[in-house]
Amino acid sequence: MVEMSNVRKEIVAFIVLLSLLLLWTLFTQAPINTSTPVNTSTPVNTSTPVNTSTPVNTSTPVSTSTIDPESQVAGMAIQFKNGTSESEVKSTLQNYNMTQNYRITFDANHYPEYYIMVNKENITDVKGKLEKEKTWTEPIPAIEKGNYYIITISERVIHNKNFIMMLSKYNLQLEKFVWCDIRFLYSDGPLTYWISKEDAIRLKNELEQNENIFTIRFDYLYPPYDPTT
């Protein structure tokens, strides 16, 4: 009986020891709580953009405040004498410093066409006749060229008998201008450019010394203000 009692005590002691061991194991293996998340609900504020609305100024313009817009000459209308050919026009202009590249429109037809050349000996009589017949001429001043005056004639009277009789009386010929439009270019391309009025006047004075050129008109980029219109 004593032996049996000892066995039971050993069994109970073993069970108690095993229970303690189990409890110790449970406590020592309790998992670390990693379920608490890192608070990432407050995002980094990336919604504030970098201010790129103010561009870098790479287009610093050349100040044109001293340039009068009405002095920018974009082209010229050149009035050549009757019979001047296109090749003669080109050859003539090549002899002058045109300042800028240009494009030629030969024989432009939107200008007065007809004229007479009156020598100084007959100019008084012819002018007297033309003043009586005011519809015979265009309201354009006569151009003095050497020993002659160039008078622009209205197309309405070129078949008028009295006008033809006057031509015969003073041995005059009715002739046609050859007009050429010049457009200055920025380069060799089609863009219209301009030259200064100062250069245009210099060029006009030089060209009008040519025996084949009567007069030159300017075509302004911004036409001068005319209070009468």
UniProtKB/Swiss-Prot annotation:
Similarity comment text for this entry: Belongs to the UPF0228 family.
The protein's name: UPF0228 protein MA_3119
Region Disordered, annotated ranges: 35-67
Taxonomic source organism: Methanosarcina acetivorans (strain ATCC 35395 / DSM 2834 / JCM 12185 / C2A)
InterPro entries hit by this protein: DUF963 (IPR009306), UPF0228 (IPR008887)
Composition bias type Low complexity, residue spans: 35-66
Disulfide bridge partners, by residue number: none
Pfam families in the record: DUF963 (PF06131), UPF0228 (PF05727)
